[in-house]
């Protein structure tokens, strides 16, 4: 199975969304770069190695708050928790413990739906159920469903407001 473009749909959607949000609201959200060491260049073929594990996909500031999140997608009826690497969980934990907003955006490709699950929700779910996956219906019932406003743009303003309400309620 070729995983080369795994997550590209969601990444493009988020990149377009944060570009618009940054412009409209003078926010600062950015995709993290992956450090790569280039070993060899042969015509158009570049051979390289990842220097170190990346933390999460995105980070940003808006109105004095810090946000850090990972983007994942699945074509199944559940989200496999093992899709989140241990170093990413550790990073999200540190953000959470330092009063930042740490979360994941999950895309269910088969349903064309997008959700936010906070770090705390993820940990609570796993500690309570010990399950290795989270069913789609749980996301529908428990998580913030993201609204797409323009073709290919998440309503980031609404997402941030909903996330703040969810965080303060948990």
From Swiss-Prot:
Disulfide linkage: none
Entry EC no(s): 3.1.21.10
Binding site for Mg(2+): 57, 70, 88
Manner of cofactor binding, per the entry note: Binds 1 Mg(2+) ion per subunit.
Pfam family, one: RecU
Gene Ontology molecular functions: endonuclease activity; magnesium ion binding; nucleic acid binding
Annotated keywords: Cytoplasm, DNA damage, DNA recombination, DNA repair, Endonuclease, Hydrolase, Magnesium, Metal-binding, Nuclease
SUPFAM superfamilies for the chain: Restriction endonuclease-like
Statement: the UniProt record of this protein carries the keyword Isomerase: no
Cofactor(s) needed by this chain: Mg(2+)
Xref: InterPro entries: Resolv_RecU, Restrct_endonuc-II-like, tRNA_endonuc-like_dom_sf
Similarity annotation: Belongs to the RecU family.
Purpose of the protein: Endonuclease that resolves Holliday junction intermediates in genetic recombination. Cleaves mobile four-strand junctions by introducing symmetrical nicks in paired strands. Promotes annealing of linear ssDNA with homologous dsDNA. Required for DNA repair, homologous recombination and chromosome segregation.
Protein name as annotated: Holliday junction resolvase RecU
């Amino acid at each position: 199975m070729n995983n080369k473009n795994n997550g590209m749909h969601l990444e493009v959607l988020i990149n377009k969304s944060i570009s618009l949000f940054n412009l409209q609201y003078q926010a600062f959200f950015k995709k993290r770069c992956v450090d790569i060491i280039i070993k060899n260049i042969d015509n158009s073929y570049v051979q390289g190695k990842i220097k170190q594990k990346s933390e999460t996909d995105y980070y940003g500031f808006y109105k004095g708050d810090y946000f850090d999140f990972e983007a994942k997608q699945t074509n199944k009826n559940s989200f496999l928790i093992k899709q989140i690497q241990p170093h990413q969980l550790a990073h999200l934990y540190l953000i959470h413990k330092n009063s930042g907003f740490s979360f994941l955006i999950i895309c269910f490709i088969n349903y064309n739906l997008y959700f936010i699950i906070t770090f705390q929700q993820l940990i609570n779910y796993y500690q309570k159920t010990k399950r290795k996956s989270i069913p789609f219906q749980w996301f529908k019932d428990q998580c913030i469903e993201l609204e797409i406003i323009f073709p290919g743009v998440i309503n980031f303003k609404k997402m941030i407001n909903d996330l703040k309400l969810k965080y303060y309620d948990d």
